Amino acid sequence: AYTGKELPWGTLTGIRPTKIAMQFLEENAPGTQNPMTEADILSYMQETYYCSEEKALLAIDIAKREKRILADIHYEKGYSLYIGIPFCPTTCLYCSFTSFPIFSWKDRVGEYLTALEKEIDFVREACQDKILDSVYIGGGTPTTLEPEELRRLLSKVRASFDFSQVKEFTVEAGRADSITRDKLRALKEFGVTRISVNPQTMNQETLNIIGRRHTVGQVEEAFRLAREEGFTNINMDLILGLPGETKEHVERTMEAVTRLCPDSLTVHSLAIKRASRLSLWIEENGIETLHNTDETMEIAAEGAARMNMKPYYLYRQKGTLQNLENTG
């Protein structure tokens, strides 16, 4: 009231606002006395944390969907496996992850895989009494590995763990300039069920600014290759608020993505990380060149809805433009 600014998530600072709604939904088990209705949860989030109605309803909707997903996995006796590949074609402007340009570190990939294989052996022993629910290979960009390096890694993973109850096996293909038919065939050969082809934007000028050395056309070609190789579960990542982008840029991106029609979409609100080159870029160009609003988030949400998608997870980060969220 004093500043004229409204924060859509109110005073909430945690990364998982859906946990609040989930807590009440889990307490509403059959036989519970005085269970909270969705209207009660909405009022609680608005009155306690000053959340907007829109964001509170989004959290409740996603929590209900998450609850159904969790009921289908071994929530207490199971585990999920994440494997990180810390190499990329180049380092993006906004990135603060542990990632090394593959062309400078190519000679060390074999050593990294050897070390990773030792860690896989350790994890296998540590988790032998648990049930593996899902596997996610991320990075970095896992597809910076050569086809035979991918086969070496995937072979080790498949030989080390019981996949009989795995619901999903994801490899983040990520950058279009790292995706080839041979690599896609290697993923398919070892039973990968889901991949990500992540353009972040479908505007060429922005791709150039953020340091992604590929074209919009390469994104479209990589997506088509994946479909040709039989992948029926393809995700795409987008970032809203990239340098110089306006709602018109987001509209163009969503039009291009809708034509490809991925099976899922992850929409990130740009987060400014101290360890990224973006911090230096802002010093030189000004933060006013970064725009993300409820309006641009809504453009993305409407585009996802046109592809018959519904949000199923949500998280937030520090330093996010307009205090917004990331939604899948």
Where are these regions (language model features)?
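A general alpha-helix detector
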Residues: 16-24, 40, 44, 205
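Auxiliary Fe-S-binding modules of radical SAM enzymes
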Residues: 1-35, 282-328
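Short glycine/serine/threonine-enriched helix-capping/active-site loop
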Residues: 83, 267, 314
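Canonical Radical SAM [4Fe-4S] cluster-binding loop centered on the CxxxCxxC motif
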Residues: 76-111
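Residues at alpha-helix termini
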Residues: 2-3, 28, 48, 161, ...
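Short, flexible loop/turn elements at secondary-structure junctions
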Residues: 85-87, 175, 316
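Conserved non-cysteine loop/helix-boundary elements of the Radical SAM core domain that shape
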Residues: 99-300
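N-terminal [4Fe-4S]-dependent radical SAM core
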Residues: 2-6, 26-27, 35-81
